[in-house]
Structure formats: C-alpha cells, structure tokens
Amino acid sequence: MANDKEIAQTEFPHQKDLKETLQEKKPSQPSLSLLCSAPPPAYPSEQASVGYGTVLARTPTIFLQARGALFSALPPPRCRARYRWTWHQGRKKKKINRPTQQRRNL
C-alpha cells in the first residue's frame, strides 16, 4: 500500500497543472532576488565612450571621446581600415619631405 502512494505522487501531472497563469508569465512586480544577482547593465553607448577594462590606461586622453561622434579622435569601427589608409598616406608624405641624417651628409 505504501508503494502505491509513492507511485501516485511521482505520476506525470495533469496538463492543466502545466499551463502557466498570466500572473506567472507577466509578473506585476520585479523579482528582487534576480535584480540583486544580475550584474549592472552596460549599455553600448557607454562601452563606446569608456572602453573595456584597463584599455584606457594605455591610451592618451584624446581617445577618451566617443568613437564616431562629431569631432571625435577616433572614427567609428567600420571606418578603421579606410582611416588607417588615409593616415598612412599622410605619414608617407611627411616622411618624404623630412630629410634624414644620411641625406644631409650626401
């Protein structure tokens, strides 16, 4: 008889019992335990201007602005290759105009 009770308790619950109520799907109050355990949200706009972790410790202060903003020091990430190409062209021009110590001696 005791065996029958255990089997009755472990049976699959009825289909009505599995359906969630509207209150369970959309609770009216936030779960405070979930709020305490979750890390604070980091928004993409903050990450763009602040960077990740200790990255900013190695960069000069001109790079602290948001990337891609008006008058910002860095272009948006999708322009990085084009930006490097144009920067390199200017660097090559400066290099040609500046004579080295060897050229002066010749």
UniProtKB/Swiss-Prot annotation:
Phosphorylated by host ERK. The phosphorylation triggers a structural change that enhances keratin binding and protein stability. GO terms for biological process: symbiont-mediated arrest of host cell cycle during G2/M transition. It is found in: Host cytoplasm; Host nucleus. Assembles into oligomeric complexes. Interacts with host CDK1. Interacts with host SRPK1; this interaction may favor expression of late viral transcripts. Interacts with host cytokeratin components KRT8 and KRT18. The major E4 form is first synthesized as an E1^E4 fusion protein from spliced E1^E4 transcripts, such that the first few amino acids of the E4 protein are derived from the N terminus of E1. It comes from the Viruses. GO terms for cellular component: host cell cytoplasm; host cell nucleus. Contributes to multiple aspects of the viral life cycle including viral genome amplification, suppression of suprabasal cell differentiation and egress of newly formed virions. Induces host cell cycle arrest at the G2 phase by associating with and preventing the nuclear entry of host CDK1/cyclin B1 complexes. Inhibits cellular DNA replication by preventing loading of host replication licensing proteins MCM2 and MCM7 onto chromatin. Within the cytoplasm, associates with host kinase SRPK1, a splicing factor regulator, and inhibits its activity. Its main location: host cell. Residues 1-27 have a biased composition (Basic and acidic residues). Residues 1-40 are annotated as: Disordered. Belongs to the papillomaviridae E4 protein family. Keywords: Early protein, Host cytoplasm, Host G2/M cell cycle arrest by virus, Host nucleus, Host-virus interaction, Modulation of host cell cycle by virus, Phosphoprotein. Residues 28-37 have a biased composition (Low complexity). The keyword Metal-binding does not apply. The keyword Phosphoprotein applies. This is Probable protein E4.
